[in-house]
């Protein structure tokens, strides 16, 4: 090894160039001595033990890390699943995505009120319709007869003995309802003082009686005329 501390090659330059085995004698090998050539030992380009030292240092550091991790208590590395579990009694109630408890309460209250309005039996519907027809203002013209609560002509209205008897004339109950024969009905909410549900029910009932009204009118037993505007 030279004074600068660099490592020399094991074979001389002449033997290495000829690719023969060198006796590695210094300062001159036996082959160079026999041939009378200059025997030189060049500096090697490989780092040698320096790379080996780096590998050993890396292994030592990894071993040290493993040893330090092994000495740490297990509870500090990962939490105990039993200690972090939330009791079922303390968990908040589940709600669908995009909803809040307040919105659910409002929706349930609206649904209950709507369900209660549609849960009336058929007999209660008939009583409500009769009461509505009784208290509803019945418009009359100058030539029309007064109607009683049942929709017929009152007995107190007597015509003159000289005037000919006229056939009874039916007047519309709701001003917005046109002639039944035309099958036209108002939208819910157009009749004042009436709930949309009741108007919808009246429209359905009137639609079912159109066919019967046409049959009676063709037989000459029912005369329907338009109300005076």
Swiss-Prot record:
One Pfam entry name: Zn_clus
SMART domains recorded: GAL4 (SM00066)
GO biological process, one term: positive regulation of metabolic process
Disulphide bridges: none
Broad class of where this protein is predominantly found: nucleus
Subcellular location(s) of the protein: Nucleus
Keyword set includes Zinc: yes
Keywords: DNA-binding, Metal-binding, Nucleus, Transcription, Transcription regulation, Zinc
CDD domains according to UniProt: GAL4
UniProt key word DNA-binding: yes
Molecular function as annotated in GO: DNA binding; DNA-binding transcription factor activity, RNA polymerase II-specific; zinc ion binding
Annotated Polar residues bias: 51-71, 153-164
DNA-binding region: 12-39
SUPFAM superfamilies according to UniProt: Zn2/Cys6 DNA-binding domain
CC annotations in GO: nucleus
Residue span of region Disordered: 50-100, 141-169
Gene3D superfamilies linked to this entry: Zn(2)-C6 fungal-type DNA-binding domain
Purpose of the protein: Transcription factor that regulates the expression of the gene cluster that mediates the biosynthesis of geodin, an intermediate in the biosynthesis of other natural products.
The protein, known as: Geodin cluster transcription factor
The species this protein was found in: Aspergillus terreus (strain NIH 2624 / FGSC A1156)
Lineage: Eukaryota, Fungi, Dikarya, Ascomycota, Pezizomycotina
Gene that encodes it: gedR
